[in-house]
Amino acid sequence: MKRAAIAAAALALTGCSAADPEPTADGTVSQDTFLTTHGLAAMDAVEIIDHLDRQKVTERPTDLIASVRADELLLSSDDQEVVVDLPDNQTYVSIAPYLTSTHDCFYHSLTTCLGELDNEDIQVTITDEATGEVLVDEATTTFDNGFIGFWLPDDAT
């Protein structure tokens, strides 16, 4: 529930080849096979998210959808999908500052979401509403997709 609160708070700021692996009867493939096929071999969820979010828009994979959920990273391609667990006690909050428009966004897509302000210098302050603790206070630059992401404690509000 607290992850939802963090996501809701972030939304106030957002605008939001190898051969094909053999699927099983239910359309799934092994996680290792899937990750290898998409150039993500040996990466954990943090590394995959960081890699995909920082990719130049023109270099993004067109055959992969990567969706950050509350407790997991859902990766899908064609009729195959795998889930990679997020680290315990952390959640990923992706923010896209905007000038003219935004939209409701429940799950950040690392491969399809585009914000308005790509490669822009910004100042970000994230404060835990319950404790007043400043979790992030830094000057940073948005990624090529117009977003910037932060790993936060999942109990922060």
Residue ranges of model-derived segments:
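Bacterial signal peptide processing site
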Residues: 17-20
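Short loop/turn and low-complexity linker motifs enriched in small/turn-promoting residues
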Residues: 32-123, 127-130
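C-terminal motif of bacterial Sec signal peptides marking the signal peptidase cleavage site
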Residues: 12-15
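Extracellular Ig-like/FN3 beta-sandwich strand-entry sites
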Residues: 119, 154-157
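Hydrophobic helical h-region of N-terminal Sec-dependent signal peptides
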Residues: 6-10
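Bacterial N-terminal signal peptides that target proteins for export
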Residues: 1-5
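Short, acidic Ser/Thr/Gly-rich low-complexity loop/linker segments typical of extracellular
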Residues: 131-145
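Glycine-centered loop-to-beta-strand initiation motif
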Residues: 142-150, 156
